[in-house]
Amino acid sequence: MSTKIVETITLECETGNYHSFCPISCVSWLYQKIEDSFFLVVGTKTCGYFLQNALGVMIFAEPRYAMAELEEGDISAHLNDYEELKTLCIRIRKDRDPSVIIWIGTCTTEIIKMDLEGMAPKLEYEIGVPILVARANGLDYAFTQGEDTVLAVMAHRCPDQEFPIGESKETKKKLFPFPLLKENNLVEYANHPPLVIFGSLPSNLVSQLDTELRRQFIKVSGWLPAQRYADLPSLGDGVYVCGVNPFLSRTATTLIRRKKCELIVAPFPIGPDGTRAWIERICPVFGIEAQSLEEIEERIWESLKDYLDLVRGKSVFFMGDNLIEISIARFLIRCGMIVYEIGIPYLDKRYQAAELALLKKTCIRMCMPIPRIVEKPDNSNQIRRMRELKPDLAITGMAHANPLGARGIGTKWSVEFTFAQIHGFANARDVLELVTRPLRRNENLDNLDRTTLVRKNNK
């Protein structure tokens, strides 16, 4: 089955199955982003082993997440789920005093039909702490969609837009009749409707993107998620929202339908080309002409010249894992690489429409063939295609890395792109560092001429 998106870009769907990292791993970066939160994963021992081993954090470090481990009594309905969770949440409130507790549902809670959404409102009223329920099970969601479900639930708790657009400055003067020292050094922003950016990024990346928009006289009203639960941005009619990650389609839908926000459909700020396109898409919405972006982008490309010489002409194959494959592929094509195939667990064609258009534009600019995009790819079919194509690099899940490496194909874990800082102008070098590491390693091994190092007559 194939569906045409734009000219010469076709989507294929092979199996309908997900082959990706577990979505409950979103806990690893969200608990660090939302500083006053506590994540409670409701699952089995397997989920606990995964969180402890895959995330590399020992329970003795007392991170702000924990496991509510399901036992045989829970599955056979011999235990009262509400009382068990209540005991845990009271202990969490006493020990950690979080501003919000987030329950993460897993595969097991789906299978036994545990009514987490039904228990949460009653329990949060009893203990006096907000409780959000996000289902991040691997049955329905791919790797990074765990964050998508959490942000979609959190969007429901965002306050409504308090002041009519254009009145907030006057209202502030009424609240604070004295001069505010902090505002003396601020940039004079253009008068535009509120803009909220959604997507979890480290604080330094948030500052970088805020700064880039500030240079265009655009003020970011808030981020979803915020560093503190109490600082969630106000949402409502007249508020514009824009995403920074390709896997947040559910959050975007919630913001449009439930909170009545206006979505700015833009490419994602990954790579200098994507960051420039992201800003250029936001500026016209507020009647602002983007300035100096071309010079900034050219300067970044010039600084990447040593990497570009290494990757130019090399081929890459995306097996699909974290839903940011199209953005990474577009950036690598702009760097001069040949992308044979883009496997992706799930693709929302409306949310990624601008990214797909930029992919096509980039391929035409670089005189490259537009890569095949395969949604929910069949791994067996992919392996056969890779044997025929013989790519220099495969960006894949961890399960396939070693077998592919044994067959002479350079590999890079897709999970590394998820945890690395790849957004904005300044971090394009980090993306290329990840990509070129296996290429450099293979070249160094070839230069060693390994066959001459083995003694034929070893006595």
From Swiss-Prot:
SUPFAM superfamilies: Helical backbone' metal receptor. The keyword Oxidoreductase applies. It comes from the Eukaryota. One of its GO terms (biological process) is light-independent chlorophyll biosynthetic process. Transmembrane segments: none annotated. Binds 1 [4Fe-4S] cluster per heterodimer. The cluster is bound at the heterodimer interface by residues from both subunits. One of its GO terms (cellular component) is chloroplast. Its EC number is 1.3.7.7. Pathway: Porphyrin-containing compound metabolism; chlorophyll biosynthesis (light-independent). One of its GO terms (molecular function) is oxidoreductase activity, acting on iron-sulfur proteins as donors. InterPro entries: LIPOR_BchN/ChlN (IPR050293), Nase/OxRdtase_comp1 (IPR000510), Protochl_reductN (IPR005970). [4Fe-4S] cluster binds at residues 22, 47, 107. Its cofactor is [4Fe-4S] cluster. It is found in: Plastid, Chloroplast. Belongs to the BchN/ChlN family. PANTHER family: LIGHT-INDEPENDENT PROTOCHLOROPHYLLIDE REDUCTASE SUBUNIT N. Protochlorophyllide reductase is composed of three subunits; ChlL, ChlN and ChlB. Forms a heterotetramer of two ChlB and two ChlN subunits. This is Light-independent protochlorophyllide reductase subunit N. It comes from Pinus contorta. The gene is chlN.
